[in-house]
Amino acid sequence: MPANERRWQTGTLVFDQVGVFFVRRLRRLRRFFKSMNYEISRKVIGCAMKVHREMGCGFLERVYENALSIELRRKGVDFERQVSLRVHYNGEPVGHYIADIIVGNELLLELKALQSITGPCKSQLLNYLKASGLPAGLILNFGSKSLEFKRMAKTQ
């Protein structure tokens, strides 16, 4: 092994510096999913899959929001629709966002009806998470042949 290469061995696994980075990241992700109510996100994704399976793609976001609300209500999930999120700067209001659905005051849902989930969609969800103070969110895209979803957590 070259002198400048650093390696660590744990049990039978050997990690170089890059491997250690990924192990630490994996541990952070595990903590995130333990802190977030994973059951709620699983239930929401299941409801979204049922809506997409029955309706298919091609409708407006509002139609999917209405259908998902019906399905969440049937499953007994506590949620709010079209929640206004105020953005402040030095105590002064500077704008607001409208979140599609907030589930159980811990998970923000952003519904899309696009070809695929893009970078601006992810940025929008992160901005909503900052404005709301919620720890995690889901982008649910009903616009493709199969339901796309992306879990995201507030990093700051």
Language-model-detected regions and their locations in the chain:
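A short acidic/basic microdomain associated with nuclease active sites
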Residues: 75-88
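Conserved catalytic cores of phosphodiester-cleaving nucleases, focusing on short active-site segments
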Residues: 56, 79, 99-117, 128
